[in-house]
Structure formats: structure tokens, C-alpha cells
């Protein structure tokens, strides 16, 4: 099964872009360039939202697609489009990524902000997180992570300090914990006690 990886760059105070989508604060170097080149060799599919797609188009990534990769853009406002390397769709992102994960191929890169990643985390589809944390506090901007419906536990795989002062961290997403029989029994007992209390109150 293919691995789904959520990755990118963020400020120390949890923003991945300014409010106007600007990323002028990102620190680029030959070291980062090599790391990113090796990183993208592990993927053949990129998933992004409308805002990330539009930034990619403005930066010259050939219509938002990346060489040798299939790019999926999820948007409710862009006109649907399907070519060999680019798919713009309004389908449910979790359903599509769930299907892609079962197919043969390299890993899948989730690129962009937390609004796109949120339903994927909640559906337990993301396997790994990798971020280049920058030594800057933006103060405001577009947040990387948003409130989710359950806790996500992580295991540190790698941590590397770059010459720019950035810290590159990689985490494995742990599978959701299964509720034990004891916990289920306790929950049932609590419901039973609550029901008896309500009955007596009547």
C-alpha cells in the first residue's frame, strides 16, 4: 500500500503562509534544494487545494502540475479539468485519497495547509508528517493545523538541524488506539448507572 505524506514548511507559530498567501519568509539554500529533490523522488502523486495550486501556477509549475507526477487539485470553485498530469475536482478528498492509496505506485504527497489535511487526518489516511520548521514567528497568517475530531499520536522518525537554522522533522502517524474491552465495559456501566439515576429522578 502506498504511503500518504503530509509535508511542507511552516513558521514556529504554526503558519505556512501569510494572510495574503505570501511565503517570502521561507529560507532557501543549496542544502534545502538537495533535500527537496530527494524528497520528491519518493512521490508520483501530489494532492493540493485551490490556494496552493494557484501559488504553484504563479511560481511557474506548468499549470500547477509537477514533472513526472499526477497532481490532484481539490476545489469547489475552480472549473473541473482532467489531463494526463492534472486533475481538478470537487470530489471528497478523503474518498479520492483513500482510492489512490490502494493503487500501485510511489507515495502520495499532501501539499498545502491544514484545511486540506484535516479530513485526511480524521479518516486516518495520513501515514507520515514531514516539515521544515523555520526560525520565525509570523504573528499571523494561514494556520498549518486546524481543530480535529480526535487526537493524533506521532512517533519521531528523524530530526535534522539545517545550516539556515531550520529544523527538519519527520513523524510517523501512529494508528488510532483500539478501545480495550475493559474501557468498553466501563463505558457501558456508566451508561447503565446514568439511566438508573434518570429513572429514579422521574
Describe the function of each predicted region.
Residues 1-202:
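Enzymes that bind and transform nitrogen-containing heteroaromatic metabolites
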